[in-house]
From Swiss-Prot:
GO terms for cellular component: aminoacyl-tRNA synthetase multienzyme complex; cytoplasm. This is Proline--tRNA ligase. The keyword ATP-binding applies. Homodimer. Consists of three domains: the N-terminal catalytic domain, the anticodon-binding domain and the C-terminal extension.
């Protein structure tokens, strides 16, 4: 049996405390003296680096090039687009003074970079021959959140923001959908998180967007988490910042824009979808250590170190971690469970005699005796099966938790059971707010699929199937 770590609260006891104890015990985040400003420890940063590396590859396949924008934005620039500043004004961090000198014109620390990209695009686009332009940056942004939680709501968080301009509405809107597909494939195939794709309601759109496409994931407590978004911005920002190009007709036209983003919030989803009461469960593609080699009393038997070295040579194309300390094997295994290592290989005197090792799967806790000579053949199959199992479990949980409802009473019952609801809905923002007061759930997205039905709240005919859930 692996050593039980007393500091981990169980999900049944308190889900929020469980989440925090996982974050702390897995050495993901360290708090600082500034509210919401957190240290992303090496374990968390390794996950983020793996996410960055894979998404960057996918973006480049679609002609996206990286750049870096400044951190500060003149506040006067926000005034050009009133709706946008209304969306972010309460969250802005401001720079009002440099040294002893107070500024006549304040700067905002970027909460997002539409304004910076707009000014950049304005200066580099001239004619239709320059289009499309597709750029992305990996950076941190700052928003003064009232309530902060690691990964879910940081005052400073890391993300990528992709911005692109096109000659036509169809091109910009189509590319927004392409990027949403990139996110969907990545989150499902690499993070093993099943998602629901859809369109945000008008009142849930990104400030300034004509359409916001989203992927929503379900956490183990039944709440939804918006995992990534892609927006068709139309000509809203183009007109505010005068981004024009000369078309083939020799006339000047405003560009059409899109933007998209995925942040370190997705690490919070990774925890709340897969982790258990022993710690993280990381999909093999994203795990900072894919395999841990744990020797049992190697300080008393140096031969075990030679076996460990042989194993490392066999498996050198994986991310490996070795622990040859004199800590008990129960403690070593428990630590790897907390950190979500997909496979642990135990090497002891007994195994040495039989020229075998014991493999422990993180997802099922199953122990398997394997001949040393078979390791190279068995490990890739095991990792593939772990990945499949993690995804299938999460997918079944999601599918079992979506319930179709016909009226507000049914919605109340479903949400009270920590599930999500699917319903025909053609109401207003005010209707949505009233529904939230009654049920604690709100609209998350409108499904891609369309059917004819009757709105469960207004009784109007509609073809909009909508997801309702409590949400982070």
């Amino acid at each position: 049996m692996s050593k039980k770590l007393e500091k981990i609260t169980t999900r049944k006891e308190n889900f929020a405390d469980w989440y925090t104890s996982i974050v702390n015990n897995a050495k993901l985040i360290q708090y600082t003296d500034i509210k919401g400003m957190m240290v992303f420890q090496p374990n968390a940063w390794a996950i983020w680096e793996a996410i960055k590396n894979q998404i960057d590859v996918e973006f480049k396949k679609h002609g996206v090039r990286n750049l870096a924008m400044p951190t500060l934005i003149p506040l006067s620039e926000f005034q050009k687009e009133k709706d946008h500043i209304e969306g972010f004004a309460p969250e802005l961090f401001m720079v009002n003074q440099i040294g002893d000198k107070k500024l006549d014109n304040s700067y905002a620390i970027r909460p997002t970079s539409e304004i910076l990209f707009c000014n950049y695009f304005k200066n580099i686009v001239n004619s239709y021959n320059d289009l499309p332009i597709k750029n992305n940056q990996w950076c941190s942004v700052m928003r003064a959140e009232k309530t902060t939680r690691p990964f879910l709501r940081n005052a400073e968080f890391h993300w990528q923001e992709l911005h692109a301009i096109f000659a036509s509405e169809n091109e910009a809107d189509s590319f927004a959908k392409v990027i949403l597909d990139v996110y969907t494939d990545f989150v499902q195939n690499y993070l093993c998180i099943p998602v629901i794709k859809g369109l945000k309601t008008p009142w849930e759109r990104f400030a300034g967007a004509q359409k916001t496409y989203t992927i929503e994931a379900m956490m183990q407590d039944g709440q939804a988490l918006q995992s990534a978004t892609s927006h068709y911005l139309g000509q809203f920002f183009a007109k505010a910042y005068d981004i024009k190009f000369q078309g083939q007709d020799n006339q000047m036209h405003y560009v059409h824009q899109m933007s998209a983003g995925l942040s370190t919030r997705i690490i919070g989803a990774l925890i709340m979808v897969h982790a258990d009461d022993q710690g993280l469960i990381l999909p093999p593609d994203i795990a900072f250590n894919q395999i841990a080699i744990l020797t049992i009393f190697s300080n008393k038997n140096p031969q075990l170190l030679k076996i460990s070295q042989q194993i490392c040579e066999q498996l050198n194309n994986y991310r490996l971690f070795e622990d040859h300390s004199d800590k008990g094997i129960g403690y070593k295994l428990a630590q790897q469970e907390i950190e979500g290592t997909p496979i642990c290989i135990l090497v002891g005197a007994k195994e040495l005699v039989n020229q075998q090792v014991v493999i422990v799967r993180r997802d099922t806790h199953e122990k398997i005796n394997v001949d040393l000579t078979d390791l190279k053949l068995i490990i890739p199959k095991l990792l593939a099966d772990i990945k499949r199992n993690i995804y299938e479990k999460a997918k079944k949980d999601l599918e079992d938790s979506i319930v179709f409802v016909n009226n507000i009473e049914e919605l109340k019952q479903v949400i009270a059971q920590n599930k999500m609801a699917k319903a025909f809905f053609d109401g207003t923002k005010e209707d949505d707010e009233q529904i939230k007061l009654l049920t604690n759930a709100s609209t998350r997205c409108i499904f891609d699929e369309t059917q004819n039905g009757q709105c469960f709240y207004t009784n109007k005919k509609t073809n909009k199937l909508t997801l309702f859930a409590r949400a982070y």
